[in-house]
Curated annotation (Swiss-Prot):
Superkingdom, taxonomy of origin: Bacteria
Protein name as catalogued: Argininosuccinate synthase
GO BP term, pick one: argininosuccinate metabolic process
Keyword set includes Protease: no
Species name: Ralstonia pickettii (strain 12J)
Gene: argG
Residues binding ATP, per UniProt: 17-25, 43, 129, 131, 136, 194
Record: residues binding L-aspartate: 131, 135-136
Keyword entries, A-Z: Amino-acid biosynthesis, Arginine biosynthesis, ATP-binding, Cytoplasm, Ligase, Nucleotide-binding
């Protein structure tokens, strides 16, 4: 059964994820002229660079949409962002600086909520602006078909007729002007930007070259902290969690998760917190490069992980991080709602997050420079008296106890010596004149 349509479905309803930009505007009008019945759906994801959401559906109607709807996706996006924090669903990092999978989270919400809205209007064909080289074409495909098994996909950017007529932005602008809309292209930037309430992605064009970097980016969620003329004052902030959910900032309770992220974005953004430069593997295994912003996610992540390390034992933390790496990849691949992802996420939310209650106080400076000033929780297993270097009453263990514990180590030490001897006889290790222990033999064997 054909799922992807390569030609305009004449006379049929076609839902388009409509941003109001040149690409989707030209695509909507072009489909209308070719005989399709375009329905426009716009996701309100709280994009920091979007000034007037209500104007977008009106614009779609002007361009020929049969119907245009604005879908408020912010509450769902905020909750998915918190779920990602709780489960540590992040697999891409460089030098300890994390990418918080904000675009994959946005696609999970957009792909499900827009297709659900289309089903309400009996629209079973969906198009969006993703290209064949990127991740989004697969993410939207998966989420769309999960939500509506009867869904067909029509993307003008996969239709050769559309490409031949409107293959570039100059052609699209000329087409819209000819149609009487006087659409002018916005000034070309040195890179492209995609954003939602959780974070922003800057990529492509000049940023495809690794000798261009963060210094050419104009942040939309924070400040250009690398510029010496940008003043950034140190600031203290406290974040409170209750059973894994953020509930207060600086002592002020915030029940609405959307408002929580907006407040954290404001605070973190004043410092440029959460910006990172990453080289990553796309779903198709080719490498790409992006520069990311996520001030609110970064604040939550730092505070949450501080409580995790103070509350849980080493084995739990290890499993949380291993599962988080795997879950981050699944999220990146468009599998956030697949059973294997739900299993990993639910495990972390139930057995890790539910114990995470407390308050962490930070001092934020420039960029990702911060200090942890205080950690408070009724669930802390950190107890300074257990390992105090001072003499304490009722010590949890004595020198004699430690002697016994060390003596027990002799068992595995004997086994280790025997194994090293076996490897030496096999030629895998050699005894050097300056070494008391066997060394790897330079990879010769």
């Amino acid at each position: 059964m054909e799922t992807i349509l390569q030609h305009v479905p004449v006379g049929q309803k076609v839902g388009i994820a409509f941003s109001g930009g040149l690409d989707t505007s030209a695509a909507l009008r072009w489909m209308k002229n070719k005989g399709a019945l375009p329905y426009a759906y716009t996701a309100n994801l709280g994009q920091p660079d979007e000034e007037d959401y209500d104007a977008i559906p009106r614009k779609a109607m002007e361009y020929g949409a049969e119907k245009a709807r604005l879908i408020d996706c912010r509450p769902q996006l905020a909750n998915e962002g918190i779920a990602a924090i709780q489960s540590g669903a992040f697999h891409i990092s460089t030098g300890g600086i994390t990418y918080f999978n904000t675009t994959p989270l946005g696609r999970a919400v957009t792909g499900t909520m827009l297709v659900a809205a289309m089903k309400e209007d009996d629209v079973n064909i969906w198009g969006d602006g993703s290209t064949f080289k990127g991740n989004d074409i697969e993410r939207f495909y998966r989420y769309g078909l999960l939500t509506n098994p009867a869904l067909k996909i029509y993307k003008p950017w996969l239709d050769q007729a559309f490409i031949d007529e409107l293959g570039g932005r100059a052609e699209m602008s000329a087409f819209m002007t000819k149609e009487g809309f006087g659409y002018k292209m916005s000034a070309e930037k040195a890179y492209s930007t995609d954003s939602n309430m959780l974070g922003a992605t800057h990529e492509a064009k000049d940023l495809e070259h690794l000798n261009s970097g963060i210094r050419i980016v104009n942040p939309i969620m924070g400040v250009a902290f690398w510029k010496p003329e940008v003043e950034v004052k140190a600031e203290e902030v406290s974040i409170t969690f209750d059973e894994g959910r953020p509930v207060a900032v600086n002592g002020r309770e915030i029940a609405d998760p959307v408002e929580m992220f907006l407040e954290l974005n404001r605070i973190g953004g004043r410092h440029g917190l959460g910006m990172s430069d990453q080289i990553e593997n796309r779903i198709i295994e080719a490498k790409s490069r992006g520069i990311y912003e996520a001030p609110g996610m970064a604040l939550l992540h730092i505070a949450y992980e501080r409580l995790v390390t103070g509350i849980h034992n080493e084995d739990t933390i290890e499993q949380y991080r291993i599962n988080g790496l795997r879950l981050g990849r699944l999220l990146y691949q468009g599998r956030w709602f697949d059973p294997q992802a739900i299993m990993l996420r639910e495990t972390a939310q139930r057995w890790v997050a539910r114990a995470v209650t407390g308050t962490v106080t930070l001092e934020l400076r420039r960029g990702n420079d911060y200090s942890i000033l205080n950690t408070e929780s009724p669930n802390l297993t950190y107890a300074p008296e257990r390992l105090s270097m001072e003499k304490v009453e009722d010590a949890p263990f004595s020198p004699a106890d430690r002697i016994g514990q060390l003596t027990m180590r002799n068992l595995d030490l004997m086994d280790t010596r025997d194994k090293l001897a076996i490897y030496s006889k096999a030629g895998l290790l050699s005894l050097g004149t300056a070494n008391a222990l066997p060394q790897l033999d330079g990879g010769k064997k």
